[in-house]
């Protein structure tokens, strides 16, 4: 008989349930969607495999899907991001969760294989590790999947590559590309939670520090804005000339990483690319420089190069490692170069995940409702869904907006 769940400590379930209830109070849109079905079960009998950070907000999504009738299995999307108390609460509630904080790479792969082995109808992913597994080692299972969703920029990039090669086995809805996701989750959520992670890991004063932000996409914009708001001097590095120009006109210093390396007190990567901070950059950094990554995978900082160029390494705080270089300089790495906001903090605030996970829930309903009719490609979230989520969010915030008059609607349709 298949194992029902695996978590670190089931006795943490009470604490986890309180965390989930706190998130529910701050996720009114998703809770309204949950209750809108009444006693209907639109996902009755549908098996959902989810690869998501196991947080209190994820729990609200998972329990919404289950209330709608789905059979949900959950694996983490990062070995270090699971909130053990939340995992315990979900297990106690009967969810098939296979996650604990501090998994080895082998345990992480086992968890993904375990949820994939439940032969899901729908796949929810954050980073596309589960999608890729279903397209490679477990392809026979992937061929039976109705469709999936993807939460992150990194994951969408991987899935579009599969689509370009003609290898995508099932339709995927790019939840990341919803306006009510990336404009808020990526910018406000990551911006705030990255600062939170750096502060929890180091407890340094931000005011007066030089913070180098690599990447000025929506994530980088949010990080740069929040650090500037706390009094930091922010330097942005970019490879995209349009984004670099935007950063410059937003008032930030823009330069190359080679130039910024000797300037920064804190370095944050947010590019989705590999070795953005490489050995040659670390060789130029000042004593005491702090390195953190806000991108999905731990590839943006060349940790292997840092290990190789160091003469010693020690854990100086819970999520902070000190690397001593041959000349005596010390560099500090937060969370092994993994997602700083989820390793050293609690991830995005519930209020922004409310919109992201509402989009996820609606995408799952769409896949189930249009089974067999969606093309095998990466789909964008429809504008009508974005507007619905935005309107619901505004309502829960007590914000009212205008509507076009009939005269205004007619005016916008004329050409002279």
Curated annotation (Swiss-Prot):
The GO cellular component terms are:
cytosol
Q: Which reaction does it catalyse?
A: S-adenosyl-L-homocysteine + H2O = L-homocysteine + adenosine
Keywords, in A-Z order: Cytoplasm, Hydrolase, NAD, One-carbon metabolism
Q: Does the keyword Aminoacyl-tRNA synthetase apply?
A: no
User: What is the annotated localization of this protein?
Assistant: Cytoplasm
InterPro entries (alphabetical): Adenosylhomocyst_ase-like_sf, Adenosylhomocysteinase-like, Ado_hCys_hydrolase_NAD-bd, NAD(P)-bd_dom_sf, S-Ado-L-homoCys_hydrolase_CS
Identify the pathway. Answer: Amino-acid biosynthesis; L-homocysteine biosynthesis; L-homocysteine from S-adenosyl-L-homocysteine: step 1/1
Q: How is the cofactor bound?
A: Binds 1 NAD(+) per subunit.
Q: Which GO terms describe its molecular function?
A: adenosylhomocysteinase activity
Q: CDD domains, alphabetically?
A: SAHH
Enzyme class, top EC level, equals: hydrolase
Question: Which residues hold NAD(+)?
Answer: 152-154, 186, 215-220, 238, 273, 294-296, 341
Source domain of life is Archaea
Gene3D superfamilies on file:
Adenosylhomocysteinase-like, NAD(P)-binding Rossmann-like Domain
Residues where substrate binds: 55, 126, 151, 181, 185
- For this entry, the protein name equals Adenosylhomocysteinase
Protein's organism: Aeropyrum pernix (strain ATCC 700893 / DSM 11879 / JCM 9820 / NBRC 100138 / K1)
């Amino acid at each position: 008989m298949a194992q029902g769940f695996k978590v670190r400590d089931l006795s943490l379930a009470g604490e986890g349930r309180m965390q989930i209830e706190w998130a529910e109070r701050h996720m009114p849109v998703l809770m309204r969607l949950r209750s809108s079905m009444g006693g209907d079960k639109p996902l009755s009998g549908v098996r959902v495999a989810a690869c998501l950070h196991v947080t209190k907000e994820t729990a609200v999504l998972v329990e919404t899907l289950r209330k709608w009738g789905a059979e949900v299995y959950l694996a983490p999307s990062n070995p270090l991001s699971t909130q053990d108390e939340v995992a315990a609460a979900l297990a106690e509630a009967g969810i098939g969760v296979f996650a604990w904080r501090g998994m080895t790479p082998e345990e992480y792969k086992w968890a993904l294989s375990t949820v994939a082995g439940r032969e899901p109808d729908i796949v929810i992913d954050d980073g596309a590790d589960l999608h890729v597994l279903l397209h490679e080692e477990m392809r026979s299972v992937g061929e039976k999947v109705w469709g999936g969703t993807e939460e992150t920029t990194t994951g969408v990039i991987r899935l579009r590559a599969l689509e370009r090669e003609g290898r995508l086995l099932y339709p995927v809805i790019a939840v990341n590309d919803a306006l009510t996701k990336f404009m808020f989750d990526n910018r406000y959520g990551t911006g705030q939670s990255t600062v939170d992670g750096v502060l929890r890991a180091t407890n340094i004063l931000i005011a007066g520090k030089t913070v180098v932000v690599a990447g000025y996409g929506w994530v980088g914009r949010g990080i740069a804005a929040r650090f500037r708001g706390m009094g930091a001097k922010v330097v942005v590095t970019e490879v995209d000339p349009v984004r670099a120009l935007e950063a410059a006109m937003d008032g930030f210093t823009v330069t190359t990483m080679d130039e910024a390396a000797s300037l920064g007190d804190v370095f944050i990567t947010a590019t989705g690319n590999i070795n953005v901070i490489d050995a040659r950059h670390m060789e130029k950094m000042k004593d005491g420089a702090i390195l953190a990554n806000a991108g999905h995978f731990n590839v943006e900082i060349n940790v292997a190069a840092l290990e190789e160029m160091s003469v010693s390494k020690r854990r100086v705080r819970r999520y902070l490692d000190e690397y001593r270089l041959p000349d005596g300089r010390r560099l500090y790495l937060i969370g092994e170069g993994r997602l700083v906001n989820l390793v050293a903090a609690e991830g995005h605030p519930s209020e922004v995940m409310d919109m992201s996970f509402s989009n996820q829930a609606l995408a799952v309903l769409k896949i189930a409702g249009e089974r067999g009719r969606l093309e095998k490609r990466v789909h964008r979230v429809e504008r009508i869904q974005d507007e619905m989520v935005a309107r619901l969010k505004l309502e829960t915030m007590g914000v009212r907006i205008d509507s076009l008059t009939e005269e205004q609607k007619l005016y916008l349709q004329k050409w002279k």
